[in-house]
Swiss-Prot record:
The keyword Kinase does not apply. InterPro entries: DUF2527. This is Protein YobF. Pfam families: DUF2527 (PF10736).
Length: 47
């Protein structure tokens, strides 16, 4: 279970990094907050 969860988290980080690089016009602070909230929401849904 730990291995599967870590793989999911890793893929999500890659997805987030891709979105961030694709949208450079977004402010750093705003993107960081949205990324953190998105990761928290996704983590709660998967668990």
């Amino acid at each position: 279970m730990c291995g599967i969860f870590s793989k999911e988290v890793l893929s999500k980080h890659v997805d987030v990094e891709y979105r961030f690089s694709a949208e450079p016009y977004i402010g750093a602070s705003c993107s960081n907050v949205s990324v953190l909230s998105m990761l928290c929401l996704r983590a709660k849904k998967t668990i």
